[in-house]
């Protein structure tokens, strides 16, 4: 009766078959994970519990049940030598048991995957495009991901970037624009190609490009022809500032820490137009440095102008020598003149003091001398000529001393015109 009813039952569709296969595959994968967890659990528990039991039994036997005789001790310790071997064999048995279960599980899983693959191939051959696409998206998403990550073939066209499309279009227009003019006027004469640098052509929305003139004519469609827009970007001018290496050793880090230099003590030079990194500058030079971008060639001005010191006056060597000579001779003359004048004035003042003192003493001595002369005249008459001679000598000396300062004082102003003449000269 079951065979009769089975004839009238509807045949399951491919979608139902694939669903059942997916369920079985999922169950087998779960069982494999569960089996691996159980294997680790049982093996770990066996080792832990057996080691704890082994240590406790060894301790108990050593403290209470260890006999004194050597043969009895040997018989008592034999089970302790056999116990690790027993544990190791149990561990291998458990690993073998779980590994066999995983092998059977993997075999069943491989069979289901092969069945699923065959059914999907039949779907791609027999079913329509729409149903086949739906079935593949539902039951075989890995193939779609693999197609997305496949590299493009060599014959496929290379997708250009947004900025590159403009460059290719402008380059193609430059190459195709002189074609009709040359066809009407005939082939132009081919002159020698100058080996100098090519001219720069500015492309809209990008840095200046160099038009590369081909040295030899090539056939259209040959494999050696270069794609327009590829390799036209100039290398750019060399950077005047050093760029720190990315990989630095321990010695470099120590030196940078001691000197106070390094990436952590520098400021990045970012272009204002394309926001690209153009090296690093020191903290003292960051605000005063102006640089040209190495990628878009934009000149980034300095944030501040460096303060300049005031300009010193210019002196020639001959003028400097003349000024030094005049400054060296002038003060010596001026210093010598006042020194001579001061000495003369001091001498004259001292002499005047001496004269005043001498005149006062002479005035005081005059009455004394008169009285003494009278006494002497009374007492001794023949001694008068000697005393008169002494008086006359004293008077002459005093008069000579009075005349000498007057002469010296008169000689002082005679020196003044000579000093003035020296100054004027």
Curated annotation (Swiss-Prot):
Region (Disordered): 144-242, 320-425
Note: Was named 'Lunapark' because the protein sequence contains the word 'LNPARK'.
Main location class: endoplasmic reticulum
The protein's role, per its UniProt record: Endoplasmic reticulum (ER)-shaping membrane protein that plays a role in determining ER morphology. Involved in the stabilization of nascent three-way ER tubular junctions within the ER network. May also play a role as a curvature-stabilizing protein within three-way ER tubular junction network. May be involved in limb and central nervous system development.
Lumenal topological intervals: 67-77
Family: Belongs to the lunapark family.
Top-level taxon in the UniProt lineage: Eukaryota
Membrane topology of this protein: Multi-pass membrane protein
Post-translational modification: Myristoylated; myristoylation is necessary for the endoplasmic reticulum (ER) three-way ER tubular junction formation, but is not required neither for membrane translocation, membrane topology formation, nor for the specific localization to ER membranes. Phosphorylated. Phosphorylation occurs at Ser-177, Ser-182, Ser-222, Ser-316 and Ser-380 during interphase. Phosphorylation occurs at Ser-114, Ser-153, Ser-194, Thr-211 and Ser-348 during mitosis; these phosphorylations reduce both its homodimerization and the ER three-way tubular junction formation.
UniProt-listed PANTHER family: ENDOPLASMIC RETICULUM JUNCTION FORMATION PROTEIN LUNAPARK
Keyword Coiled coil included in the entry's annotation: yes
Subcellular compartments: Endoplasmic reticulum membrane
Domain notes: The transmembrane domain 1 and 2 function as a signal-anchor and stop-transfer sequence, respectively, generating a double-spanning integral membrane protein with a N- and C-terminal cytoplasmic orientation. Transmembrane domain 1 and 2 are probably sufficient to mediate membrane translocation and topology formation in a N-myristoylation-independent manner. Transmembrane domain 2 is sufficient to block the protein secretion pathway. The two coiled-coil domains are necessary for its endoplasmic reticulum (ER) three-way tubular junction localization.
Keywords: Coiled coil, Developmental protein, Endoplasmic reticulum, Lipoprotein, Membrane, Metal-binding, Myristate, Phosphoprotein, Transmembrane, Transmembrane helix, Zinc, Zinc-finger
GO CC entries: endoplasmic reticulum membrane; endoplasmic reticulum tubular network membrane; nucleoplasm
Record topology, Cytoplasmic segments: 2-45, 99-425
Pro residues bias spans: 186-195
Name under which the protein is recorded: Endoplasmic reticulum junction formation protein lunapark
Gene giving rise to this polypeptide: Lnpk
Annotated lipid attachment (N-myristoyl glycine): 2
